A protein has these predicted regions:
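Short beta-rich binding modules
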Residues: 1-172
Length: 172
């Protein structure tokens, strides 16, 4: 049994925690991690404010970063929602969801046809789970920890109008 537990030949962890470089384009598959809030329980309630968000996990599908997991919160309603001013957090989140739908369904952002408008509609937030799209990687750092190396997030979803879309999605 002891010979079955010999880890001398295992790879070192040197590169195991390296971040994916910012602005890298990757094909990902999105999963929503339900938080029990909002319609059908797909949203997560912030612990520090009335904000609601989608707690997502995106798995890189192919390429040198295949199988890497990227955790991103997509705003749905900000802490100022319902009060004075715009809901910037929620608006950014809705823009991200629109981008995910356009990317997954091959729709250009400037397409206003009935088919394109229909592609941007969902009946449930759960429909976002399982969608594959082109994501632009970003790096978020903890502002309270200046030495923080950060973590990868999906900064944007790229649609069919982006020059690299077809290559990353595997259409070309």
């Amino acid at each position: 049994m002891a010979s079955d537990m010999d880890f001398n030949g295992a790879d070192t962890q040197d590169a195991a925690f390296d971040l994916i470089p910012a602005n890298t384009l990757v094909k990902v598959c999105l999963t929503i991690r339900p938080g029990g809030a909002g319609p059908e329980g797909w949203l997560t309630q912030s612990k520090t404010s009335p904000a609601l968000y989608l707690n997502t996990e995106a798995v890189v599908m192919e390429g040198p970063f295949a199988r890497r997991r990227i955790y991103t919160r997509i705003g749905f309603r900000g802490k100022a929602a319902g009060g004075p001013g715009d809901d910037t957090y929620g608006n950014r989140g809705r823009a991200m969801i629109r981008g995910i739908l356009e990317s997954a369904r091959g729709v250009r952002a400037d397409d206003q046809s009935n088919a394109a408008r229909g592609a941007r509609m969902i009946r449930s937030l759960g429909e976002l789970s399982g969608l594959e799209f082109v994501g632009r990687i970003g790096i978020e750092r903890d502002k309270d920890k200046p030495d923080d190396t950060g973590r990868n997030v999906i900064k944007a979803a790229l649609g069919a109008d982006h020059a690299e879309y077809a290559r990353v999605m595997g259409s070309v």
